[in-house]
């Protein structure tokens, strides 16, 4: 032997080998093998697998000489296999928790029926008619096991179960799963019919006063040897595993409680029975202790049941001290004692008894009641939110958005309550350093977030704040407050009361500044500034608020005014006017701008023109937000002023781009296309990008009715937008000498940035203009080479079909722009079917099939009076129907696919038949058969259900096909009417599903 061979042999011999798995038939050949196998630490196969194998082999049907399937024969082999299955269950001590977890309902049903059979329970006799006290202990125990399993299975079937993710389709496996599913449903149907009897049997068991016995492996062997002496009080019936009365009653009480609790959802009075059984279970568990072998009760689940029963059926003899906080909260909510809920939550902040999720659910419930009109709950919602926030702070979680929203406008009462909750939620002497640190950080952050110094002093002077924060931390906080507001002089020592501070000049200045910030009356603003300038000449009062913002093109002119009072007044009037315009407070904005115009007319022609421009913009916005919404045309003088602004050529006048932008949008919205295309001066077209864009849009709208060859401006508009959406490529040499390509997202290749174009478009409301822009961007989106699903749009044929330099276009930005444009256009008119189809196509292209169906259906609904009329064929084209079919198919709604195949100009039978063959359908299936009008599809359905043995569904298909209006000999008008009626009902059903 060579050295290599010796090494291989040594390696092979040293490798541990896995012992072969014991086969089921080996247990038939050797009687003692089962006990040896079960005594192993990790037997393979496991005990529950053995039960499945034994019963599977014992229940296999046989085939006779005529090749006919016969039921499994009652021979010695099958009897031994069933006995082996029972012995394995006896080894597991008949623990239903283990058996239910590992065995399917049909297998466990077979096992327990075999137990009843071997325990000599007379077949066909109702268990409820049998006297358990007169039966042998093992027989009574077998009946109890079966009835316990029955109600446990009913309860378990009521819980939602997550469907297992199907693997690759395999016909045999799928058929087997389908058979097992149907068998389980049949067993559950029988068990539910027997549920009342099962409960009576278990209630009778609670009246038993004797110990019971359950079969062991030894007693089962004795039964096999002495079948004639089983039913008497012999050794066999009392030699099993002893189950004490208390253990049996404890387990039965728990199972009955679960059954009653499940039934309580339909009859709330039954919750009282559930409560009684669960609390009796707790008492028996306390008596039995941890020595029980038979009781396998999940004590956490039992505690949850008891808590739920306390809430649903509060005990009359329990006082509030005996109830859990959870129950107390529910009782208070039911009685409307919301202040008591607040106190419970504050006390719970010390004990952390209530789950955070429960506290949040209480707050959500109260918020909903407050939103429904119960204004008295607003204060309670705030208090509960504060309690929850303090709990979150103590446990180191982030502060909720709700607290920040409710604390936007603090007042003295809110601050007082917050400090009370904080003080009562922490025991400073016993609390850990982490709890103290969390609370201190929270109080500091609250201080930093407050603008009113009165409230800051309330917190900083509080005992808890002084206790938790060290001197250094308080000094640091003071420094931070000083940086935030240089005019604030905080003292480190706590102030007893804010109102005790004596008034001084600085306080008077602060009060006037506060009034200056709040006032929108131009004459009051002027008076305040005169007073302030009389008190001090060193200050620049236009800097009082950082919210006062004036565009830089204006501020350089305004700040050049030499007189301090005039400069402050002009700046503040303009800043406040611009702010009011932004928040759509147009009347106050008009007052402020008018006062500013009167002021600057006296000394600055430049600022006078600025104010005239701003007042023009204000008038445009006022009209568009007011009567313009209802379609009323603007007055002719406003249109003349807009033209005058566009044609203005005054040098050195500071201009805001937004004014020109709004003016062009205004002209497009009111269809002033003649002016934009023929009367705009040439210099404007060259110098103002918005005028150029507006002229191209207006000209394209005018040329739409003409032939394609005459649409020169459409090509010009296309080139302008392509340039805007193009990226500039720059080459950069790195440290390693390599040249890399950099794409500049916002390039200056076009007449404006893409973001500016988007901002301009969002000022348009004219449907035709928006349709043209949307059509252009959709075409640009479809031009890309890697596009899989095109998006459709109106007038898409007017645009060029290719781009010379395809790589230069930023298609990612184009896709984002298309989505934003569709979102905006639908906010203008949510009933435009063409825009809805575009939105649906976008969702389809991004594989959001449910959303795509929503918009396809909405597009059909808006142009057919919710499908009461026929959907126009130019809306539901074959392409749209095919995309709806694909969406339904990918959502596993295969019956919907088959019905939609009828909507095509030529019915797609291949797709319809293939979809109907799918068994894993997530739609209403046979409930949709009434919507099928094509007889060929109905005939195929009848054949398919007959082939599968689905009698009920076959009858539904036959009933649908038998309707007289579908008779092929009917006139064409009758058949069309029948099809239209079914289309209407189907589309309305789909709309209810996806809307």
Curated annotation (Swiss-Prot):
Function: Component of the integrator complex, a multiprotein complex that terminates RNA polymerase II (Pol II) transcription in the promoter-proximal region of genes.
TPR repeats mapped onto the chain: 250-288, 320-356, 570-603, 833-866
InterPro entries: Int8
Domain of life, source organism: Eukaryota
Keyword Acyltransferase: no
Name of the protein described by the UniProt record: Integrator complex subunit 8
Alphabetical keyword list: Chromosome, Nucleus, Phosphoprotein, Repeat, TPR repeat
Gene Ontology biological process terms in this record: protein localization to chromatin; RNA polymerase II transcription initiation surveillance; snRNA 3'-end processing; snRNA processing
Record flagged with keyword Nuclease: no
Cellular compartments annotated: Nucleus; Chromosome
Subunit structure: Component of the Integrator complex, composed of core subunits INTS1, INTS2, INTS3, INTS4, INTS5, INTS6, INTS7, INTS8, INTS9/RC74, INTS10, INTS11/CPSF3L, INTS12, INTS13, INTS14 and INTS15. The core complex associates with protein phosphatase 2A subunits PPP2CA and PPP2R1A, to form the Integrator-PP2A (INTAC) complex.
Location of Phosphothreonine modifications: 18
Primary localisation category: nucleus
Recorded GO CC terms: chromatin; INTAC complex; integrator complex; nucleus
Gene: Ints8
């Amino acid at each position: 032997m060579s050295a290599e061979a010796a090494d291989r042999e040594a390696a092979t011999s040293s490798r541990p080998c896995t012992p072969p798995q014991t086969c089921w038939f080996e247990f038939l050949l050797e009687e003692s093998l089962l006990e040896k196998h079960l005594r192993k630490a990790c037997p393979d196969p496991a005990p529950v697998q053995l039960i499945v194998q034994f019963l599977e082999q014992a229940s296999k049907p046989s085939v006779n000489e005529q090749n006919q399937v016969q039921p499994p024969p009652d021979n010695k082999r099958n009897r031994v296999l069933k006995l082996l299955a029972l012995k394995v269950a006896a080894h597991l001590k008949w623990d239903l928790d283990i058996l239910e977890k590992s065995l399917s309902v049909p297998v466990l049903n077979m096992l327990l029926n075999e137990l009843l059979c071997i325990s000599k329970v007379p077949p066909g006799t109702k268990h409820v008619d049998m006297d358990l006290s007169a039966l042998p202990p093992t027989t009574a125990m077998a009946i109890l096991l079966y009835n316990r399993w029955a109600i446990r299975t009913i309860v378990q079937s009521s819980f939602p179960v997550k469907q297992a993710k199907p693997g690759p389709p395999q016909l045999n496996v799928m058929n087997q799963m389908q058979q097992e599913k149907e068998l389980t449903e049949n067993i559950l149907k029988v068990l539910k019919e027997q549920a009342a009897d099962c409960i009576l049997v278990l209630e009778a068991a609670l009246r038993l006063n004797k110990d019971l016995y359950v079969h062991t492996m030894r007693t089962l062997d004795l039964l096999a040897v002495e079948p004639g002496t089983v039913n008497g009080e012999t050794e066999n019936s009392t030699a099993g595993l002893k189950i004490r009365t208390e253990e049996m009653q404890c387990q039965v009480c728990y199972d009955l409680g679960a059954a009653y609790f499940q039934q309580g959802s339909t009859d709330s009075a039954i919750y009282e029975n559930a409560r009684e059984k669960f609390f009796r279970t707790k008492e028996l568990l306390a008596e039995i202790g941890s020595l029980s072998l038979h009781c396998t009760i999940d004590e956490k689940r039992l505690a949850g049941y008891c808590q739920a029963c306390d809430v649903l059926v509060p005990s009359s003899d329990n006082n509030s001290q005996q109830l859990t906080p959870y129950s107390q909260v529910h009782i208070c909510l039911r009685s409307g004692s919301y202040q008591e809920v607040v106190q419970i939550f504050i006390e719970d902040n010390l004990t952390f008894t209530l789950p955070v999720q429960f506290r949040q659910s209480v707050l959500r419930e109260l918020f909903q009641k407050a939103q429904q009109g119960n204004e008295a709950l607003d204060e309670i919602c705030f208090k509960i939110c504060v309690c929850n926030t303090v709990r979150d702070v103590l446990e180191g979680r982030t502060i909720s958005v709700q607290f920040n929203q409710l604390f936007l406008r603090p007042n003295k009462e809110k601050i007082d309550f917050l400090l009370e909750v904080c003080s009562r939620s922490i025991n400073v002497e016993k609390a850990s350093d982490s709890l103290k640190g969390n609370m201190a950080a929270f109080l500091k952050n609250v201080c930093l977030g407050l603008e009113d110094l009165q409230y800051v002093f309330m917190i900083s002077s509080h005992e808890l704040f002084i206790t938790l924060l060290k001197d250094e931390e308080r000094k640091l906080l003071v420094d931070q407050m000083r940086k935030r507001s240089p005019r604030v002089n905080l003292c480190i020592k706590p102030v007893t009361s804010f109102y005790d501070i004596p008034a001084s000049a600085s306080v008077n200045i602060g009060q006037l500044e506060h009034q200056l910030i709040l006032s929108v009356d131009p004459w009051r603003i002027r008076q305040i500034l005169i007073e302030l300038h009389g008190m001090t000449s060193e200050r620049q009062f236009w800097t009082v608020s950082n919210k006062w913002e004036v565009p830089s093109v204006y501020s350089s002119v305004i700040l050049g005014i030499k007189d301090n009072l005039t400069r402050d007044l002009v700046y503040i009037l303009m800043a406040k006017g611009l702010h009011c315009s932004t928040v759509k407070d147009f009347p106050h904005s008009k007052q402020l701008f008018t006062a500013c115009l009167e002021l600057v007319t006296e000394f600055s022609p430049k600022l006078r023109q600025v104010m005239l421009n701003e007042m023009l913009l204000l008038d445009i916005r006022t009209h568009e937000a007011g009567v313009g919404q209802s379609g009323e045309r603007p007055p002719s003088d406003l249109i003349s002023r807009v033209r005058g602004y566009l044609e203005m050529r005054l040098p050195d006048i500071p201009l805001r781009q937004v004014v020109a932008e709004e003016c062009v949008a205004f002209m497009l919205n009111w269809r002033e296309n003649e002016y934009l295309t023929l009367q705009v001066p040439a210099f404007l077209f060259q110098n103002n990008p918005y005028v150029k864009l507006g002229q191209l849009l207006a000209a394209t709208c005018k040329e739409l009715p003409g032939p394609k060859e005459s649409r020169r401006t459409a090509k010009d508009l296309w080139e302008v937008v392509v340039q805007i959406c193009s990226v500039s490529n720059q080459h950069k040499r790195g440290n390693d000498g390599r040249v890399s390509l950099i794409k500049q997202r916002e390039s200056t290749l076009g007449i404006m940035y893409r973001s500016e174009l988007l901002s301009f478009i969002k000022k348009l409301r004219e449907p035709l203009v928006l349709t043209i822009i949307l059509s252009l961007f959709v075409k640009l989106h479809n031009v890309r080479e890697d596009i899989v699903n095109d998006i459709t749009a109106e007038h898409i044929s007017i645009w060029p079909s290719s781009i010379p330099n395809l790589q230069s276009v930023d298609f990612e930005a184009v896709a984002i722009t298309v989505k934003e444009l569709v979102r905006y256009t639908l906010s203008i008119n949510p009933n435009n079917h063409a825009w809805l189809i575009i939105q649906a196509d976008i969702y389809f292209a991004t594989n959001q099939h449910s959303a795509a169906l929503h918009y396809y259906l909405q597009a059909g609904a808006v142009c057919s009076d919710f499908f009461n009329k026929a959907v126009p064929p130019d809306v539901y084209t074959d392409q749209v129907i095919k995309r709806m079919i694909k969406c339904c198919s990918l959502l596993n709604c295969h019956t919907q696919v088959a019905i939609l195949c009828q909507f095509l100009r030529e019915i797609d039978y291949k797709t319809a038949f293939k979809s109907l063959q799918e068994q894993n359908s997530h739609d209403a299936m046979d409930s949709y058969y009434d919507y099928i009008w094509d007889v060929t599809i109905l005939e195929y359905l009848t054949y398919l259900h007959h082939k599968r043995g689905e009698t009920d569904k076959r009858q539904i298909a036959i009933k649908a096909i038998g309707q007289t209006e579908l008779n092929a000999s009917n006139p064409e008008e009758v058949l069309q009417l029948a099809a239209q009626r079914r289309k209407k009902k189907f589309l309305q059903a789909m709309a209810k599903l996806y809307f």
